């Protein structure tokens, strides 16, 4: 039972991260396969309603706020190396330098404690932003199973961002085990962080698909 639950939560992280880390702002979307996207979206909402949301309710009940906040800081800290590289590729060298310093100092506590005192919630640049800065079009809008809303460019950006995960760069033999533990926790932590916002969109929208798509392109 525990293995099955972990598998469900590992898959669910992709649904949540794609909703919480949207970086591009567009007013319209090219959605050439909307019927397919809507079918996948319905599946994702079913998964969220009957697996992730109930698990998150338990997580919020038993997890103290200070631990939730520490986990959020840790997961944001893990994005700093990739953010530094992407800022450099975009010509934002001062921002890149600050991210390197932030990551280095906070590494003393693995990001769980904000030693630098800076706002850890400020999103780091990602490869989707970098590709945008080089004039690469987003391509078609896609809704992926578990991964949620994205674009063709966003898929490529996500894959590139994954190569800069500090756990992958460390090259340890226990990376798979660490990730298997980290991913379900990240899924619950992120779903808890945006719990009310996601539920508001999901349960109070006439056309949830269109609303989630609009949010993706406007955030």
Label the predicted regions.
Residues 19-36:
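Bacterial Sec signal peptide processing site at the extreme N-terminus
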Residues 77-152:
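Mid-length scaffold segments of soluble, non-membrane domains
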Residues 32-67:
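Post-signal-peptide N-terminal segment of Sec-exported extracytoplasmic proteins
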Residues 53, 57-87, 112:
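Signal peptide-directed extracytoplasmic domains
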Residues 34, 129-219:
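A structured, mid-to-C-terminal "fold-capping" secondary-structure block
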Residues 36, 66-73, 96-104:
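Alpha-helical scaffold segments that form or flank carboxylate-/histidine-based iron centers
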Residues 1-8:
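Bacterial N-terminal signal peptides that target proteins for export
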């Amino acid at each position: 039972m525990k293995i099955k639950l972990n598998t469900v939560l590992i898959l669910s992280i992709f649904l949540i991260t794609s909703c919480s880390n949207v970086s591009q702002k567009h007013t319209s979307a090219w959605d050439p396969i909307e019927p397919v996207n809507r079918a996948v979206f319905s599946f994702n909402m079913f998964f969220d309603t009957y697996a992730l949301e109930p698990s998150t309710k338990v997580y919020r009940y038993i997890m103290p706020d200070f631990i939730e906040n520490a986990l959020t800081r840790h997961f944001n800290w893990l994005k700093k190396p990739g953010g530094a590289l992407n800022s450099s590729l975009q010509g934002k060298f001062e921002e890149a330098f600050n991210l390197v310093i932030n990551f280095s100092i906070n590494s003393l506590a693995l990001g769980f404690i904000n030693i630098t005192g800076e706002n850890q919630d400020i999103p780091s640049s990602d490869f989707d932003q970098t590709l945008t800065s080089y004039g690469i079009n987003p391509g078609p809008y896609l809704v992926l199973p578990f991964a949620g809303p994205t674009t063709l460019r966003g898929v490529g950006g996500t894959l590139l961002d994954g190569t800069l995960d500090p756990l992958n760069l460390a090259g340890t033999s226990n990376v798979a085990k660490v990730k298997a533990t980290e991913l379900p926790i990240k899924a619950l932590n992120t779903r808890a962080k945006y719990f009310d916002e996601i539920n508001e969109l999901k349960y109070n929208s006439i056309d949830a698909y269109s609303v989630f798509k609009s949010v993706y392109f406007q955030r």
